[in-house]
Amino acid sequence: MWRVASGLHLRLFEMDTDITGLARMRLGEHAIHTWDVAVALDPSATVAPDAVGLLIDTVGQLATWAGKPDGRERRIRVSVRDPERNFVLTTGEAVGLTESDGEESLPELRLSAEAFIRLVYGRLGRQHTPPVEADGVDLDELRQLFPGL
């Protein structure tokens, strides 16, 4: 059996990560590609809930890396459920996603955590979109910001 040296850091895809981060990236790939196969057979398929529970807390780093800015300045509250989290999505010259305390009044997107993860991975096409609530937000514009990995 081998042992990983503590403090091991890797530079992947212009991001610094450790072994835990690498495992989380692989989990995300596995969960999304499993969904890719499942949805071909069952249009109502979803990403595994246990994977969603782990991935939602690191979706900000992925959004920053995967987002393709269009130059349009936006600040959007993203409220997700199952599990419940609140973020602020910013766009302009870059795409950013940070945790939010929910205090300021912003245009808002409300959807499941599973659907939001698929949006960031570029997998929230119209044919596979569960119910969402968008107040002052154009979901099609957000789809263009996250064209897929």
Where do the protein language model's features map onto the residues?
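Short, structured loop/turn "capping" segments at alpha-beta junctions
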Residues: 2-8, 44-47, 69
